[in-house]
Design a protein with these regions (language model features):
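N-terminal cationic and glycine-rich segments that engage phosphates or anionic surfaces
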Residues: 1-101, 105-438
């Protein structure tokens, strides 16, 4: 692999793309340190330390700590991620958007433009909501019109700029720009998480016990990463045979292919959906200045917080995990139904003279695909749940408050593998052996 890296840097085009990507990521991290004029940067740092829930910790992990620091990139690329998911969902409900999706490159350009507009709109709404919800509570010490406008414009412009950076990386760099920016944000929190793990499990122990704890933590991380790699790479290939037919005086067709169905078809989307919905009540309560009492509402909010699940002192809060698990399985089926349509696949196969050996074309093929799909979706959802549960157990049972969870690992591994594949394809074009063949 290291030899391949050296070979990659020998190719001017690939080397330029890697350097371009690196420079853009440096800009992202530098921008994360630029403060917004007119805000109290210590407000969220103090506020986070007093919160019992982890709703905003989930959000802050995706921003690389920019939200807690209240930099100009506080909203980061989360509005873009949200708008992309919204547009994907609307393609089913709105026929015009569905036509654009199927209209090749021209249609994709139109959808991209719509996603940009929705991103800016969401960023503006989130900025206004943040100013209204936290401004008078101390985030903006001097609530003048100029300060309010400055904060709203800074947050919106920062999110729009990061969207532009992501698109430039996709166009001129390596990998998917938005995904790489998200990965770097998550990785930027790793040093603080390592410090937390050290102070929680290793520092208070003797040398022998501390070493054992370090080995166990490392083993858990390695096992989790391996599970994610297996989950991302696992596929079920459905064999497809095409009937022979006469074209003029020649017999054509008869070739065979396959339909690769990924076990984790929905990717990390079910986890993001489930985590976002579980966090929503706590976020609303925070904007309203509520949720820190001892009433039934506060207990419900604590039950929805991941850091309270598997708590040895309050096992009843683990009911929140049951709801979380059900939501992940539900969204795995829901999102896969959007991205893969067995009816459409079966119909296209029938039109092209294709069939699955042993299965009749048409409705039987559709039923067979649905049966296989339902099975592998369930396996993929359980795999996602296992990966996400491991860090949650550490947080709840041992009180290790870390942001580097299963969602983060899934995103990082997925982005790394996808970027390596892209570099691999460029290397193969130039007759070099690539990463994935070693």
């Amino acid at each position: 692999m290291f030899q391949t890296l050296r070979n990659a840097f020998k190719v001017k085009d690939i080397r330029s793309k890697i350097f371009y990507t690196f420079l853009m990521l440096v800009v992202v991290r530098l921008g994360s340190q630029l403060p917004i004029p007119g805000v109290d940067r210590s407000y969220f740092a103090n506020w986070f330390s007093q919160q019992v829930g982890d709703a905003f910790n989930f959000f802050d992990a995706f921003t690389g700590g920019s939200f807690e620091e209240m930099s100009i990139f506080a909203l980061n690329i989360t509005p873009y991620i949200t708008s992309s998911i919204i547009i994907d969902l609307l393609t089913i409900a709105i026929p015009k958007l569905e036509e654009m999706q199927k209209d090749g490159e021209e249609g994709r350009k139109k959808l991209t433009a719509i996603t940009r507009y929705v991103t800016v709109g969401l960023a503006l709404l989130e900025s206004i909501a943040m100013v209204i919800g936290f401004g008078r509570q101390g985030l903006i010490p001097d609530m003048t019109a100029m300060n309010v406008i400055t904060v709203v414009v800074s947050l919106t412009a920062g999110s729009a700029f990061l969207m532009w950076v992501g698109e430039r990386i996709t166009e001129k760099g390596v990998g998917n720009g938005i995904s790489i920016v998200l990965m770097i944000n998550i990785l930027s929190r790793v040093p603080s998480d390592i410090t937390t793990l050290y102070e929680t499990f290793i520092k208070p122990q003797t040398v022998a016990k501390g070493a054992l704890a370090a080995v166990i933590i490392l083993a858990v991380i390695v096992v989790t990463v391996v599970l994610v790699i297996l989950l991302n790479g696992a596929t079920r290939n459905i064999p497809v045979q095409y009937a022979k037919k006469m074209q003029g005086r020649k017999m054509v067709g008869g070739q065979s292919s396959s339909i690769p169905l990924k076990v984790n078809t929905a990717g990390v989307i079910p986890v993001i959906f489930a985590s976002s919905l579980m966090s929503m009540p706590s976020i609303i309560a925070a904007f309203m200045g509520r949720g820190n009492g001892n009433g039934i509402g506060s207990k419900i909010l604590k039950g929805l917080s991941q850091q309270n699940w598997f708590s040895l002192s309050n096992p009843v809060y683990t009911l929140g995990f049951v709801l979380y698990a059900v939501m992940i399985v539900f969204f795995a089926y829901f999102y896969t139904s959007i991205t893969f349509n067995p009816i459409e696949v079966a119909d296209n196969m029938k039109k092209q003279g294709g069939f699955i050996p042993g299965i009749r074309p048409g409705k039987p093929t559709q039923d067979y695909l649905e049966k296989i799909l339902n099975y592998i979706i369930f396996i993929g959802a359980i795999g996602l749940l296992i990966v996400c549960t491991i860090p949650i157990v550490f947080n709840g049972a041992f009180g290790a408050s870390v942001s580097f969870g299963g969602t983060s690992i899934i995103i990082i591994v997925g982005v790394v593998l996808e970027t390596l594949k892209q570099i691999e394809s460029q290397m193969l074009v130039r007759n070099y052996r690539g990463f994935l063949s070693e």
